[in-house]
Each structure stands twice: as C-alpha cells, then as structure tokens.
Regions:
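Periplasmic-binding protein-like
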Residues: 158-163, 225-228, 236-237, 266-295, ...
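C-terminal motif of bacterial Sec signal peptides marking the signal peptidase cleavage site
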Residues: 18-21
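N-terminal segment of the mature folded domain
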Residues: 26-29, 33-39, 50, 60-196, ...
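Ligand-binding pocket segment of bilobal, Venus flytrap-like solute-binding proteins
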Residues: 213-278, 285
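Bacterial N-terminal signal peptides that target proteins for export
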Residues: 1-11
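Ligand-binding cleft/hinge of the Venus flytrap
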Residues: 93-100, 180-240
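Extracellular/periplasmic juxtamembrane helices and adjacent flexible linkers that interface
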Residues: 2-3, 26, 37, 68-70, ...
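Short helix-loop capping/hinge motifs at secondary-structure junctions, enriched
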Residues: 171-177, 196, 209-217, 291-298
Length: 376
C-alpha cells in the first residue's frame, strides 16, 4: 500500500466512549498501566472530543529499583492527534513491560492534529509526536523541533496507515457502495469542516482523487465536490463530533477513517462501513523531537511502535500496519482495487495550496458559497 507510480496531471466516535481523530477541544484524564492494559476505553473515557491524558505511571517494581542506568524513572511527553488514544493505552502498557520501557512514565496529550502541531511549535513539551497529516510534521521540521531526516526509516516515517471509508447505518439501508452514491438526491452526508479537522482533508482528497481515478477531468472532479457538499448536512469542528453525531442519528453516511469505523463497531456501535474501490491511503507520521531530554527512551518507544509487537497492537485495534508481514486475526484490511496516495495528487504541498489555501483554495470557495466558516 505504498505510493503508486502515476502522478495525476492536475494535481471520524460516539459521545460516550470513542475518541476520534480531529477534535479541537481538550480535556484531562489520568491513566495507569493496569487500566490501559485492561481496556483501551479506560484511557479514552474522558470525552468524545480530544483529550489530554495525564501521567501514565511506570510499574511499581521499576520505580522501586530505579532502572536502566538512568538512576530512576523518566517521563516522556507524547503529543498526538486523538484517534490513536485507545491504541496508545495498550501500546504504552506493553512498552512498560519491556526492559527499555520499565522505567518510563508518560504524559499524553491528544487533540486535533493541526492544533497539536501548533502547540508544540508554541512550546508545549514533546518527546514523541504523531500526527494525522504530514503537513503538521513539516511544521515541526521547519521549527527545528523534528530533524529533517525523521522519515529515513523503511516506513518513511509513517507508523500506521488507514483508508478513507464510508460509514453507514446498520444494514446499509441507503445502499451506499461508492462515491457516486453520496451525491444522489436525498442522501444526507456528514464530514467535518476541513478548516478545523485534519480528517476532513483526507476525506475531501479521497473524494476528489476517486473521481480522477475514474477518468474524470479536474473540472468534473471539482463539480463532484460541489455536488457532494450540497448533500453535507453538518460540518462539525472535529471528526469525533461528526462520528458522535452520526451515531446519535444524524445523516445517512459519514466519511471517515477505516480505523474509526472498526473501533466504533468494536465498542458496540450499530454501524456498518464501505471501502470504495477508489479511495485514498491515509498515512500517519511519527517522530522523536530534537528537543527531547530523553532521546534514548524516546527512540526506544518509537522503535517499539514500529516493532512486530507494536504494529500488532495497532493492527488489532483497527490500523493498517506499516511493518511488512504483520497481520490481524481481528481485522482483514482488504486492499481496494483503486487505492491511491497523496503523492498521486501531487503531494501535500500542492494539495494544500489547491484545495485549502485560505484565499484561493477550491474548498475555501465551495465552503464560502455554502456559508460555512473557513477559519477556526
């Protein structure tokens, strides 16, 4: 599921228990390794919006013995977009059972990807960062907070993948099969506002790119987006709020991450989901910061996330692993026939300018014509 060779020429949680990818709010909670290990919901029980989880303590035996030549525990600050919070509840607990992680505590901050990146640039402590969008990692590189070669590993810096999917009511009563169904009269669509939600940008680029994959021109793909937004009944500020609204009864279909739909089903939400034949590969970047006071421990944690054990945890909770050979008995992860990547749309710089520039962006114009805010 790596980028295709061809480059095109013209170029989502219930309000009770789920945590989704692009919220603009924060709340606080405290988690411990025992709570995290027993239930991912324990770390995600704060709200359906983004959250900041306070210190996750190291095992008592490690605290009592000091450890790893450091003379005692160290605390890593993990700053991430909010979707993987349930996964990190398990990942941190598992890492703390390894020799490298036995003396490591964590302070965790989860929120909208762009907001999290801006917070780190503004001074929020961070040892390890994971974002929804590559552009957010680029902000930190430009600020000298992440090294220019952060993506030099075999996975090119992407710790997990997903795909843009269509979440439907149980039984799919509207018969949603692909993107063309979203612009039919009477179909009510939910997707977040792309000027506050990173997941919304994946959704929009997935919708546009699918039209190009089907052989349509740029003008025709643009017309599709205009028709799509006429059917969008709510544009929440975050992916989590959009999923919460959908689970609460709003709309017929929600455009969202595949992993969000999988996690919603795992938590008992009455939804189904469809992966279109032509859809966009979502890639989530991870890095150690240059400002970390604990580079050895931070790198050890990142290495664990890329390891067989770490990737297995990601896979079992709904993310597509980036380490070759990792599979899940829980989730099958079918490969869509027309899977494409952001590289096929010219890369993030070109796509951001074309679609989301605050003055000249295509989506900016569509949103303004519909009376939707294009600023946070």
């Amino acid at each position: 599921m790596r980028p295709l060779n061809r480059v095109l020429a013209t170029i989502a949680v219930s309000s009770l228990v789920l945590v989704a990818g692009c919220s603009s709010k924060k709340s606080t909670a405290t988690s411990s390794p025992s709570a995290s290990a027993s239930s991912p919901a324990a770390a995600a029980s704060t709200s359906a919006s983004a959250s900041t989880a306070a210190t996750s303590s190291a095992p008592a035996s490690a605290a009592a013995s000091g450890s790893a030549g450091s003379g005692g525990d160290v605390t890593l600050n993990l700053v991430a977009y909010s979707t993987p919070q349930p996964a990190y509840a398990k990942l941190i607990a598992a890492f703390q059972q390894t020799p490298a992680g036995a003396h490591v505590k964590f302070t965790q901050s989860y929120g909208a990807s762009g907001d999290q990146a801006n917070a780190v640039v503004s001074g929020q402590p961070a040892d390890v960062v994971e974002f929804s969008l590559l552009t957010d990692m680029t902000k930190l590189v430009k600020a000298n907070i992440v090294a220019p070669d952060w993506n030099s590993n075999a996975q090119k810096g992407f710790v997990t993948d997903s795909v843009v999917s269509l979440v439907t009511r149980k039984g799919n009563p509207k018969g949603i099969k692909d993107w063309s169904d979203l612009i039919k009269p009477g179909v009510k669509v939910l997707t977040p506002n792309p000027f506050s939600s990173g997941s919304a940008r994946w959704n929009i680029l997935g919708a546009y790119g699918a039209q190009i994959k089907e052989g349509k021109t740029d003008a025709e793909a643009t017309d599709y987006l205009k028709s799509l937004f006429k059917n969008v009944i709510v544009q929440d500020a975050s992916g989590s709020k959009a999923l919460a609204d959908f689970v609460g009864g709003a709309g017929d279909v929600l455009i969202s991450y595949e992993n969000e739909a999988i996690y919603a089903q795992a938590k008992g939400q009455v939804v189904d989901y469809v992966i279109p034949n032509d859809t966009l590969l979502i890639e989530n970047p991870l890095a150690v910061t240059t400002t970390t006071k604990h580079p050895v421990e931070a790198k050890a944690f990142v290495d664990f996330l890329y390891s067989q054990a770490g990737q297995q945890i990601f896979a079992d909770i709904g993310y597509r692993p980036t380490l070759p050979g990792v599979t899940s008995t829980v989730n099958k992860f079918p490969t869509p026939a027309g899977l494409f990547t952001i590289a096929d749309l010219g890369g993030w710089t070109a796509a951001t300018t074309k679609f989301f520039d605050p003055t000249t962006g295509l989506i900016t114009a569509i949103e303004k014509s519909n009376g939707v805010a294009t600023t946070k």
